[in-house]
A protein has these predicted regions:
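Conserved active-site alpha-helix within GNAT-family acetyltransferase domains
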Residues: 123-124, 134, 145-168, 172-173
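Active-site rim helix/loop that mediates acceptor-substrate recognition in acyltransferases
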Residues: 25-57, 69-72, 95-96
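Helix-loop element at the rim of GNAT/NAT acetyltransferase active sites that forms part
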Residues: 1, 14-30
């Protein structure tokens, strides 16, 4: 089952994130504050996938197995500034950069525990959050993999995301990322 998440789900969501991204436990302290800060954005939206069907929920602990969250992008945020700089370096026109960065939803996170991947949870989570979007564009970053050969890339392509930037790096993470865009929601 899935439902919108709230701040009390944060620790379980962080566990899903660390497992899905194969990050070391010390990443928890690096990401905790930015995640909490994001929950205060007026446009913050999130969904979680849980193991227990609602009808049989008889416990206080319902294991979280998938998460997604995002918010209306702020053209002055750290992430937006990095993406805009990458777009300039890639030769995008200033008017194109402005039109995208002034009206986008930042799909900040979409993760499913590895043992639950391949069952459509990511698709359902992504579909739920996209249905709520009011912005003209959705932007996301995902680690590059050879030949786009993983479930995340297949999901994003299936859901209509196209390349904005490829082999893009962020400070603090040496891995290359694809920056993807979906337009015309």
């Amino acid at each position: 089952r899935q439902r919108q998440m709230c701040i009390r789900d944060r620790d379980d969501a962080m566990d899903v994130y660390l497992a899905a991204m194969h990050y070391r436990p010390e990443w928890r302290s690096l990401r905790r504050d930015p995640w909490e800060e994001a929950t205060y954005y007026p446009t913050w939206n999130s969904y979680g996938a849980f193991t227990t069907p609602l009808a049989s929920l008889s416990t206080n602990h319902d294991p979280l197995i998938g998460i997604t969250f995002g918010y209306r992008g702020n053209p002055h945020s750290w992430w937006s500034n990095r993406i805009a700089a990458g777009m300039r370096s890639a030769g995008y026109q200033a008017t194109t950069i402005t039109s995208i960065m002034d009206n986008y939803f930042e799909l900040s996170e979409l993760h499913v525990l590895p043992s639950y991947q391949g069952h459509g949870l990511g698709t359902r989570l992504l579909d739920s959050i996209l249905q709520d979007c009011q912005e003209h564009h959705v932007l996301l970053s995902t680690p590059e993999v050879p030949g786009e050969n993983n479930a995340a890339w297949r999901l994003y392509r299936h859901m209509g995301f196209n390349d904005l930037l490829r082999n893009f790096t962020f400070p603090g993470d040496s891995r290359p990322f694809g920056i993807l865009i979906r337009t015309g929601l």
